Amino acid sequence: MQINFSFGVDVYQRQLSNLSVHIMHHKGPIILAGDFNAWSRPRVNVLKRFARRLRLKEVIFDNDWRTKAFGKPLDYIFYRGLSLNKAEVLITDASDHHPLIATFY
């Protein structure tokens, strides 16, 4: 599913709401990762509410080298039904986003 770029939060919230329908009905572990385009405080708030409502935990990176826009990280990993073992951000010039790596058990 694609979370499109738009300036308002209404479309963003609707897209995440559409995604939440699928996640709510999923039985078993979940890993949800990608570029969420959460480049503003209102978008970050919508994304965090989305994750809380679905009981998704956010992967926290000790050395947070995630790609940012306007000081906000764009890329996230959320999970449920798993335990986080390790998380890191690789620094590379192979893409305009640094890869996020997380291992779970």
Predicted stretch roles:
Residues 1-105:
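Active-site regions of metal-assisted phosphoester/phosphodiester hydrolases
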